[in-house]
Amino acid sequence: MENEMHRRITPSYVQFLTSFSNGLDIFHGTLALYGYRYSFKRDETHAQQPFNLAWLQIEKPRNSTDDMFFIGTYNWDYSFLYVTPDQKVHFCHREDATSLFTWDSIEDMLLSEIKRIYTLFDDRGVAIDPKHPTTPII
């Protein structure tokens, strides 16, 4: 995957991909962390793959710099998450890489976001208020 991206994957995200999950989809894309997609076939065997991490390194917002490693998106407005060299995770809008919110680590981001996003859905997984943004900053 690093060869395809022509860059190294940030260490904390390598740890996530190799020890926890090859990408992650929380509440059907409310928050998606990208990973290694080995096939683009759409049959049942290949349908559960993550979004391709390499794509995020190409389709970046303005103001982004080479030291920002993009790892995920929110489907509400296609805003981004990225990791900086200090391994902090940042939230930004899709058009501008200026950090609007920061977590100290991928683990901190996951714990707080899963808890927060969980409160936006009922017991059946349906959005309580479909018009309410699902991003960390409104």
Question: At which residue positions do the language-model features occur?
Answer:
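Short helix/loop capping segments that flank catalytic or ligand/cofactor-binding pockets
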Residues: 79-81, 91-92, 100-101
